Regions:
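N-terminal membrane-anchoring alpha-helices
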Residues: 2-42
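Catalytic nucleophile-loop/oxyanion-hole region of alpha/beta-hydrolase
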Residues: 115-141
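Short beta-to-alpha linker loops that shape the active-site pocket of alpha/beta-hydrolase fold enzymes
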Residues: 108-113, 177, 298
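Gly/Ala-rich beta-loop-alpha elbow adjacent to hydrolase catalytic centers
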Residues: 149-157
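Serine-hydrolase catalytic core
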Residues: 65-70, 216-298, 310-319, 323
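The alpha/beta-hydrolase serine catalytic core
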Residues: 32-61, 176-244, 295, 302-311
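Short, surface-exposed "cap/lid" segments of acyl-processing enzymes
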Residues: 56-100, 104-108
Length: 335
């Protein structure tokens, strides 16, 4: 009997330890209002100067594509994912901007395109602050705004659409990251999780030699500090804690890669994407134009020239969605 009490006592103490350390450091964020620029080009030049000072790799810096010096009927803001860059979405998004003659801006998230240590040390608050400021600045580019985000960028776009429903006129979510596919990743929600992960798996997740030879390596972090995943986990925990899906009213288009149980997105949970989309559709304010598109030929990254995917399907669905949202009837040709 004493042994049983002793065992139960240990189990109880361990359970209490898990509960306390799980909630010990709940991520917090509040947008710090900053003076906005009088024109977008001034903001853009300042961001490029910052990128130059940080020695951002070529092709990873911010990019502005203008079809008018004035506001276009709508503009597009693209937000890339964790460890990625604008190359993640350029092939499809550039074509969309060209087809609709829409001003387009690709943000460079803090800690990206620079070096592994900068990526590791950039907090989720910095990433969200920069994204929110870019979003507010982009109102100068178009009369209305289309927000496109891939993976972590989809998570951030979800947050912005929930916080600013009147400012997001169309939301395109590409493999949005709402949860990890590896159940071990829950470890990052504990205060000791990052240190434990470093002990078990080492400090850096190394890429293969084949991955390093791939031209895409110039635009993604192939090697990554596991500590950087803590920032992604914190971002996810904070955003999902705001209950964003109950607040989204913008027309929403979701793309996800799924062919079967064996062939599906291995970086972000497909079931979490579909569950989130279901919550949006059931929140009482959802747009009738909402649509989820299953892409059977693809992978986690769907909009990039460096990754194979059904671009014809993706372009057709996105263009139709935009035409429906803005009541357009354009005959589009991809020349």
């Amino acid at each position: 009997m004493k042994i049983l009490k002793w065992i139960l006592g240990i189990i109880g103490t361990f359970a209490l330890f898990l509960v306390v350390t799980f909630y010990a450091e709940t991520p917090k964020y509040e947008y710090k209002s900053v003076p906005l620029y009088s024109n977008f080009d001034s903001y853009y030049r300042e961001k490029l100067q910052i990128s130059r000072s940080k020695k951002v790799r070529h092709g990873n810096e911010e990019k502005l594509v203008r079809y008018s010096a004035d506001k276009t009927d709508f503009s597009i803001l693209y937000i890339h994912g964790f460890g990625a860059s604008r190359a993640e979405g350029e092939e499809v998004t550039d074509q969309l901007a060209k087809d609709f003659k829409a001003n387009l801006y690709y943000v460079r998230l803090p800690g990206h395109g620079t070096n592994l240590e900068n990526h590791r040390d950039t907090t989720f608050e910095e990433i969200l602050q920069d994204s929110e400021t870019a979003f507010l600045e982009c109102e100068k580019l178009g009369k209305k705004t289309i927000l496109i985000g891939t993976s972590m960028g989809g998570l951030i776009s979800t947050y912005l659409a929930a916080k600013y429903p009147e400012k997001v006129h169309a939301l395109v979510l590409v493999s949005p990251f709402y949860d990890f596919t590896n159940p071990f990743s829950v470890i990052y929600q504990f205060s000791w999780g990052k240190d434990f992960a470093n002990i078990v798996m080492g400090k850096i997740r190394k890429s293969t030699e084949e991955e390093k030879r791939n031209p895409a390596s110039a635009f993604w972090y192939r090697d990554q500090y596991l500590a950087a995943v803590q920032n992604l986990s914190d971002l996810r925990e904070f955003i999902l804690g705001t209950d964003p899906f109950s607040k989204i009213s913008s027309p929403t288009l979701l793309f996800y890669y799924y062919k079967n149980e064996k062939n599906q997105d291995v970086s972000a949970s497909v079931s979490s994407m579909l569950n989130a989309f279901k919550k949006v559709n059931e929140n009482g304010k959802a747009s009738p134009l909402n649509k989820a598109v299953k892409v059977e030929f693809g992978n986690h990254v769907l909009f990039s020239k460096y990754m194979k995917s059904d671009k014809d399907l993706i372009l057709k669905e996105t263009e139709t969605f935009i035409q429906n949202v803005f009541s357009l009837n354009k005959n589009l040709s991809h020349n």
